[in-house]
Structure formats: structure tokens, C-alpha cells
């Protein structure tokens, strides 16, 4: 069997995850009107997905190692298909929020299973690097076409169509994964499932992500935020104790002594706090400052998505030439420069062409850095721990993104408010400049990533 067929399925899975996450944003106003959401509750159509995804990633990664990568992948894609179908038929706010929470669990199972499949099907080196670049480009495509496709579907067929479109894609991914991926091989040594670690770790991280999502809207002294903070700290402390005493911990402690994993986790958190927050502020700029509609906003993200996809491919080639750590540092430096240039162009009367130089620089740096992060995170990790390694790294991705967006939204709002309700143009510029500074902080972290020979 050609190695290209499994990669096609893995790339399609990443496209589905990215598409499903982004496509809902454009549909939110229609969903709110049709289902009668209170204004302050509508954000939970997105937040429910974010909270459960972030909370269950560690569990999803370990499930891939213990239960089998193919099995976990197929179950996760099936959960996506079924929950998307149910979501399209939702008739009440609570039902749709519950469906999105289930979709988030599906994503938490699917993402680490996908990464660990890449890292075990393709040998470390050029083959794996190339596969990760293709996978990353598919994710960039999903993020872009989510906005564009969402605008078209909502205008032509109504908001349920943004859920229905994922059903055949996710079902096809599940079927193809079962047919094409290698049969799961039982672990060489019998392992027990760390139930106590799974419960305390999943609950603690879920509450942590919840408070980070909830606090910017409700306030940091809101009772639900304070209770979540106390419980999260207590559960994560208990999780640490449980893990040190477990014979087969959910997260093997030796992984944190593995330089090739720890440094990418730190860079991933910075990456998500900065690069991943940028589309939020660009969307506000396009819609509230410049007055773009949903479809025009989707079209505005075409160029960034294409450039990010190009950056993922360029990153893979640069790794072969100069190594992972240099390419990652270069990508972060390029992204920081681009974000600074972009911030200068975010004026009340600016035009889209003025944004393009910054968009191109940011996109190239973002794409190259994304490929490098996952190359580094899987390097030198044993095959039977690839799932939990990707789960740990992707948990850093989720927590970093939640922290970064919360801080940046507060910063932008403190500078000034737009009449439409969001931050003013000055506030958006300040947030983007802060993003540039944050990305720059990732450059020295990138140099701590495990060195690889340029030709490997």
C-alpha cells in the first residue's frame, strides 16, 4: 500500500478538525437568533468545544497508546460525525452546547491519535517531516475554508448546514482510517489504566481551561471562576501525587526529562497564545472597524491560509537544510516581524492591501513554526508513548491559547471600545503589537529545542 493513502486520510482528519472549529464562528449570529440564545450565552457554542478539547487531550493521547491508535482514531472520527449530525438538528441552546462539548471530546481523541499515527507510520527524518508539513497545510486550509464555507452555507442554507457538512467528511475519515491504517499491536508489556490519574488530570485541566475561557467575560472575581480556580489547583496537585505513585501513570514522568519534548511544549504554548489569537483580532478589525460582512471576512482569510500552507512546506525544506531549532527560531522571528508590520497597518481607515505585507510575513513564520513544533515533539519519543507525547504538547497548545486570548482581549479592551462593542482600532493595534512581542519571546525558547542534523 502506498504511504500516500494514510497521509491523505490523516490530512483530511486535520482539515475536518480545523474546518469544524472555525466554521461555527460565522454562523453564531444566525444560531443565536434562531435558537433564542441570550447574548452572554452564545459564546458557549464555541467555548464548550474549547473546554472539553483542552481537558481531554491528555486522556486522548494515552488512549491512543493503550487502546490503539487506529481504534482511537476511528472512534473519534465517528463521534465527530454523529455529534455533527445531532448538532444540525438541535432546537434549543442547551442541546447545541452539549453537542459542541461532545465534539470537543471527539477532537481531544482525534488530534493526538492523528499525530501519533504520523509519528509511527512514517520514520523519523525526512519522511515524517514531509508528512507533518502536509498535515499542517491541511489544517491551514481547514481554518481558511471554515470561514469562507461557513459564510456561503449560512447565507444559502441556514446555520444547520455548517454542522451537516462535517458528517460525510468525518464518516469517510473513520471508514478510511479503519481500512488503511496498520492494525493496532498490543503493548509489549501489560499496562494498567491509570484511572485516578485520568479522572484528576482531566477534571483539573478542564476546570483550568473553563476558568480561562470564562474569566474574560464574567470577571476574575466571579464566583464560578474562583471556585474553578481552587478546584483546578487542588485536582492538579492531587494528579501530581497520583502520577508519582502510579506504576503506569497517565503521563510518564520521564517524558518531562526529555528535552525534545519539554522545549516544544513551551514554544507551543507561546505559539498558541500569539499566532492562534491573531485571527480573533483580525476578524474584529474586518467586521467592526472596516464593516466587512461574513462572506467578505471569509474571503479576507484566504490569503493568510494560503501563506500558512506555503510556510508549512517551506519549514519542512528548511529543517532539512539547517535543522529544526534554527528553522523554528527563524519562523518565530519572521512571525514577530510580520505581526509588528501588521499592527502598523491596523488603522481605522486602512485597506486590505496595506495589511498584506504583514499577513505574508506572519503566515510564512506561522506555517514554518507549526511544522517544526510537531517534528520536535515526536523526535526521540518511543512509539508506545507517541500518543501521550502529542497529548501533552497539544494540551500546551490549548492552555497557551486560552491564556493568551484572555490576556490580549483584556489588554485590547482596556485601550478603548468600538461603538459596535468590541475593542477600538487602537485597542486592536495594541493587541497585535503585544502578539509580536510574545512571538519574539519564542525565539530564545526555539533555540532550546533538541538539535537535529541539517540533513536528517
Please identify what each model-predicted range represents.
Residues 31-32, 63-64, 149-157, 212, ...:
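Interfacial helix-cap and linker-helix signal at transmembrane-aqueous boundaries
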Amino acid at each position: 500500500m502506498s504511504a500516500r493513502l494514510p497521509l491523505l486520510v490523516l490530512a483530511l482528519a486535520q482539515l475536518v478538525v480545523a474546518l469544524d472549529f472555525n466554521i461555527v464562528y460565522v454562523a453564531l449570529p444566525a444560531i443565536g437568533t434562531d435558537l433564542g440564545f441570550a447574548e452572554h450565552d452564545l459564546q458557549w457554542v464555541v467555548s464548550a468545544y474549547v473546554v472539553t478539547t483542552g481537558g481531554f487531550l491528555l486522556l486522548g493521547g494515552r488512549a491512543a497508546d493503550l487502546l490503539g491508535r487506529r481504534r482511537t482514531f476511528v472512534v473519534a472520527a465517528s463521534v465527530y460525525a454523529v455529534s455533527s449530525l445531532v448538532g444540525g438538528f438541535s432546537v434549543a441552546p442547551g442541546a447545541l452546547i452539549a453537542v459542541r462539548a461532545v465534539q470537543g471530546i471527539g477532537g481531544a481523541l482525534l488530534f493526538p491519535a492523528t499525530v501519533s499515527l504520523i509519528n509511527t507510520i512514517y520514520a523519523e527524518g525526512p519522511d515524517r517531516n514531509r508528512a507533518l508539513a502536509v498535515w499542517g497545510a491541511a489544517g491551514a486550509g481547514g481554518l481558511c475554508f471554515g470561514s469562507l464555507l461557513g459564510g456561503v452555507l449560512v447565507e444559502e442554507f441556514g446555520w444547520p448546514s455548517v454542522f451537516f457538512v462535517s458528517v460525510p467528511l468525518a464518516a469517510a475519515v473513520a471508514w478510511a482510517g479503519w481500512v488503511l491504517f496498520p492494525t493496532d499491536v498490543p503493548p509489549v508489556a501489560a499496562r494498567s489504566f491509570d484511572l485516578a490519574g485520568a479522572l484528576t488530570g482531566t477534571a483539573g485541566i478542564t476546570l483550568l481551561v473553563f476558568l480561562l475561557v470564562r474569566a474574560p467575560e464574567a470577571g476574575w472575581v466571579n464566583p464560578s471562576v474562583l471556585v474553578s480556580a481552587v478546584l483546578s489547583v487542588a485536582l492538579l496537585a492531587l494528579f501530581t501525587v497520583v502520577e508519582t505513585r502510579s506504576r503506569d501513570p497517565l503521563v510518564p514522568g520521564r517524558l518531562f526529562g526529555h528535552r525534545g519534548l519539554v522545549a516544544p511544549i513551551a514554544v507551543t504554548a507561546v505559539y498558541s497564545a500569539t499566532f492562534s489569537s491573531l485571527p480573533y483580532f483580525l476578524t474584529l478589525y474586518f467586521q467592526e472597524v472596516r464593516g466587512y460582512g461574513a462572506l467578505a471576512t471569509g474571503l479576507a482569510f484566504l490569503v493568510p491560509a494560503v501563506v500558512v500552507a506555503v510556510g508549512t512546506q517551506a519549514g519542512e525544506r528548511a529543517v532539512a537544510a539547517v535543522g529544526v531549532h534554527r528553522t523554528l527560531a527563524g519562523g518565530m522571528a519572521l512571525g514577530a516581524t510580520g505581526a509588528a508590520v501588521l499592527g502598523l497597518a491596523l488603522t481605522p481607515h486602512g485597506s486590505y492591501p496595506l495589511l498584506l505585507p504583514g499577513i505574508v510575513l506572519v503566515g510564512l513564520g506561522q506555517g514554518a513554526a507549526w511544522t517544526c513544533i510537531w517534528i520536535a515533539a515526536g523526535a526521540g519519543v518511543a512509539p508506545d508513548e507517541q500518543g501521550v507525547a502529542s497529548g501533552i504538547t497539544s494540551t500546551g497548545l490549548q492552555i497557551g491559547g486560552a491564556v493568551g486570548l484572555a490576556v490580549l482581549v483584556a489588554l485590547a479592551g482596556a485601550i478603548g471600545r468600538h461603538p459596535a462593542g468590541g475593542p477600538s482600532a487602537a485597542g486592536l493595534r495594541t493587541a497585535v503589537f503585544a502578539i509580536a512581542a510574545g512571538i519574539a519571546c519564542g525565539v530564545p525558547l526555539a533555540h532550546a529545542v533538541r538539535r537535529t542534523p541539517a540533513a536528517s
